[in-house]
C-alpha cells in the first residue's frame, strides 16, 4: 500500500489497535492474536495498528514486532496494518525496515525513548525514520515528542511519505494550529487515552477519526458511538458516554497502566486468550475484572 493509499485509509473510518497476547512463558502468542485480529477486521475498521501502544509496544523487542505484523497481515483480510515504531533513531529506522519487509502497510512513529529533545532534534529524528522506509508514516505527538506546527510543516515539505498526525497531548490550541497550517496534507487522528471522551472536541478541530481502545472488546458499541458522533447525534453520544465510557474511565484511572491493562482484561472477558500484560504493567484485580465484566455485559450488541 503506497503512502497516499494508507493516508486515505487512515481517514476513512474508526480505527483500533489490537492488544498483543502473551503465553504462559511471556512470549508472543500468534494463534490467539490472529483469532482476535480476524474478529476485529469484521467490524469495518479500515486500519488496525499492530504492536501499538495498547499492543504494549514499549515491552516488545524489535525482533518481535515484524512477527506480530506478519501475523496481523495474515489474518486481517482487507484491513490495512500499520505498525508501531519508536525508540531511538537508529532502532526506529531498523524497526521501520523490518515492518516493511514483513508486509506492513505503514508505521505509527511513537515518541523516542526517555530524553527530551529540541525541535531541531525531533525534526532530524522523524526525517531519518521517514527516509528509512517507503511506507506511509504517521507521527504521534505526545509526552517528550511534541512537534510544533512549523517543525511539522518542514517535515511535510521534506518527507513525502509523512502522511498522518496523531495527537495525544490534548492541546487543542496546538492541534488546531496544525490542522489550519497543514490542511489536507495530512490525515489527523485523535490519540488521547479512551479517545471517545475527547472525540467531540477533536472533531471541532478537524480530526474526523481516532483510534478506539474499547473497539478491542466492544467493537459494535465503539462503532455505534462513532456513527453517532459523525452524524451529530449528541443524544446518543451522551447516553453512551454516561452509561459506558465514564464508568470505564473511572476503572481505567484506578492505577497507572490500566489504560492498557483494562483493555486487555476486556479482551479476555469477551472470550479471547489475551494472556497477561507484561511488566512493568499490572493486571486488573479480580474485583476490578468483575466490575468490567458487568459493564461489558450491559453493552453487548
UniProtKB/Swiss-Prot annotation:
Question: Pfam family of this protein, just one?
Answer: DHDPS
Per the UniProt entry, what are the Gene Ontology biological process annotations, in alphabetical order? D-glucarate catabolic process
Q: Does the keyword Lyase apply?
A: yes
Keywords of the record, alphabetical order, are: Lyase
Report if keyword RNA-binding is assigned: no
What are this entry's molecular-function GO terms?
Answer: 4-hydroxy-tetrahydrodipicolinate synthase activity; 5-dehydro-4-deoxyglucarate dehydratase activity
Q: Which InterPro entries match?
A: Aldolase_TIM, DapA-like, Dehydro-deoxyglucarate_dehyd
Recorded metabolic or biological pathway in which this protein acts: Carbohydrate acid metabolism; D-glucarate degradation; 2,5-dioxopentanoate from D-glucarate: step 2/2
Reported EC number(s) for this entry are 4.2.1.41
Catalysed reactions, semicolon-separated:
5-dehydro-4-deoxy-D-glucarate + H(+) = 2,5-dioxopentanoate + CO2 + H2O
Q: Which family does it belong to?
A: Belongs to the DapA family.
Instruction: State the name under which the record lists this protein.
Output: Probable 5-dehydro-4-deoxyglucarate dehydratase
Q: Which organism is it from?
A: Cereibacter sphaeroides (strain ATCC 17023 / DSM 158 / JCM 6121 / CCUG 31486 / LMG 2827 / NBRC 12203 / NCIMB 8253 / ATH 2.4.1.) (Rhodobacter sphaeroides)
Amino acid at each position: 500500500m503506497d503512502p497516499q493509499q494508507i493516508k486515505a485509509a487512515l481517514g476513512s473510518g474508526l480505527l483500533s489497535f489490537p492488544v498483543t497476547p502473551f503465553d504462559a512463558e511471556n512470549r508472543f502468542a500468534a494463534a490467539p492474536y490472529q483469532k482476535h485480529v480476524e474478529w476485529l477486521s469484521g467490524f469495518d475498521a479500515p486500519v488496525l495498528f499492530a504492536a501499538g501502544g495498547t499492543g504494549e509496544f514499549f515491552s516488545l523487542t524489535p525482533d518481535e514486532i515484524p512477527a506480530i505484523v506478519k501475523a496481523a497481515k495474515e489474518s486481517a483480510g482487507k484491513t490495512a496494518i500499520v505498525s508501531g515504531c519508536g525508540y531511538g533513531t537508529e532502532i526506529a529506522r531498523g524497526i521501520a525496515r523490518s515492518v516493511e519487509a514483513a508486509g506492513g502497510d505503514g508505521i505509527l512513529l511513537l515518541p523516542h525513548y526517555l530524553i527530551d529533545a529540541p525541535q531541531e532534534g525531533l525534526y532530524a529524528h522523524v526525517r531519518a525514520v521517514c527516509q528509512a522506509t517507503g511506507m506511509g508514516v504517521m507521527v504521534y505527538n505526545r509526552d517528550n515528542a511534541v512537534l510544533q506546527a512549523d517543525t511539522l510543516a518542514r517535515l511535510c515539505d521534506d518527507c513525502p511519505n509523512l502522511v498522518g498526525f496523531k495527537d495525544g497531548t490534548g492541546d487543542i490550541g496546538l492541534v488546531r494550529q496544525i490542522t489550519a497550517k497543514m490542511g489536507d496534507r495530512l490525515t489527523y487522528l485523535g490519540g488521547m487515552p479512551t479517545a471517545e471522551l475527547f472525540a467531540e472536541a477533536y472533531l471541532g478541530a478537524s480530526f474526523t477519526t481516532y483510534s478506539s481502545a474499547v473497539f478491542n472488546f466492544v467493537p459494535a458499541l465503539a462503532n455505534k458511538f462513532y456513527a453517532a458522533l459523525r452524524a451529530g447525534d449528541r443524544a446518543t453520544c451522551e447516553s453512551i458516554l454516561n452509561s459506558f465510557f465514564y464508568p470505564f474511565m473511572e476503572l481505567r484511572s484506578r492505577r497507572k497502566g490500566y489504560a492498557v491493562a483494562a483493555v486487555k482484561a476486556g479482551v479476555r472477558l469477551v472470550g479471547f486468550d489475551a494472556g497477561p500484560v507484561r511488566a512493568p504493567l499490572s493486571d486488573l484485580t479480580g474485583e476490578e475484572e468483575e466490575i468490567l465484566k458487568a459493564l461489558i455485559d450491559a453493552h453487548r450488541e
